[in-house]
Amino acid sequence: MKIQTDAANVLQRASAQLKSGLLKEKPLWYDIIAKYPPTSTNDLIKKSHVYEGKSDPRNNSIIYKYPNSNNKNNNVLFKTRPSNKELKSKNHNIHKLPKLKFIEDSLRKIFYQQHPWELSRPKNLIDNGNGNNNEKCDWSHMLQLHKPLDGESVVQRTLWLLKNNTTKGLTMVEAYDKARFEFYKLRMSEEMESHVAKEESTMYGSVFTSTTVNWNLSKEQEYINDWTIIAKERTQVIEANMNKSSAPIGSVVEEEKSQSSLFEDLLSNDNLQSEPEVEQSGQQQQQEQPKQETN
C-alpha cells in the first residue's frame, strides 16, 4: 500500500494557497501546525538499530574496517541478529485469540476425573432462553429444586463457598472437599430412598418389567442366536469345500494321494495280466462256433 503524504504536507499546501491567494485568511490551526509539525514520511519507515561501540560481544568477529585507515575508532559494529530480550518481547500470537480460562472448568475437570461414572448418568439439557439456568438456584445449600444433583452442583457450591464464606477463609481445596462431602451424603440418601421404595413396592405386589437396556440386550441376543445357527451351516460348507483337493497335477497333495501299498500294486498288475487272457479265450470261442456251423 502506498504511503499517504497528504496529511504530512498540509502545512506546505496551506502556505502555498495563502501565497497564491486561494485562501483569504490564515486557518486557525496554521500556527500550531507550524510550531508542532507532523511527522515526516521518513519517520514512518522502521530503521534498523545500529550498535555503536563494542557493547555486544557476539559482534566482535563482525567488524568492518574502512580501507586505508589505521584508526581504531573507525571500526564499527553492526547488529546482525536480535538479542534474547528482543526475541522475548516479540508478540508472535498477536492475531491469535486468547484462550479463556475459568475456575469452573478446572473444578469440572478435577471432579469428573475423580468420578468418571457420573458422566454415565442421563442429563436433560434445558435452556430457559437467557442462557443462565442457575438464576433460580440458591447455592447456600447443595440440594436444589430446579436442578438435579450432579457434578455441576459441586462446582457451583464450591464457588459460593469461596465468595460468601467470610467468617473463615477457605482455600480452593478446602471448599471443594466440603462441597464434595455434601454431594456424597445427598447421593447416598438418594440411593437408599430408591432401594427402600423398590422393596416396599415389591412387598405390595408390584411387578417391575425389564428396563430399556435389558430389553435391547434381549433383542440383540435373539439375533445373535439366529446367526450362530447360520454360521454353523456355513462353516460346515466351507470345511467340506476345503476337503476337496483343488491342487494341480504333480503337486504334493496329488503325490500323497497317488501313493499306494505294494500289495495294491501287485493286485493291479495281476488284474491287468488276466484281462488280455480272458479276451483271447473269448475270441477263440467265437472262431470255433462258426466252424461247427459249417460242418
Swiss-Prot record:
Domain of life of the native organism: Eukaryota
Entry's localization field: Mitochondrion
A GO molecular-function descriptor: structural constituent of ribosome
GO cellular component, one term: mitochondrial small ribosomal subunit
Main localization (coarse): mitochondrion
Keywords: Mitochondrion, Ribonucleoprotein, Ribosomal protein
Annotated segments matching region Disordered: 249-295
KW RNA-binding (keyword) present: no
Compositionally biased spans, kind Low complexity: 273-289
Subunit composition and interactions: Component of the mitochondrial small ribosomal subunit (mt-SSU).
Stated role: Component of the mitochondrial ribosome (mitoribosome), a dedicated translation machinery responsible for the synthesis of mitochondrial genome-encoded proteins, including at least some of the essential transmembrane subunits of the mitochondrial respiratory chain. The mitoribosomes are attached to the mitochondrial inner membrane and translation products are cotranslationally integrated into the membrane.
Family: Belongs to the mitochondrion-specific ribosomal protein mS23 family.
Protein name: Small ribosomal subunit protein mS23
Lineage of producing organism: Eukaryota, Fungi, Dikarya, Ascomycota, Saccharomycotina
Gene: RSM25
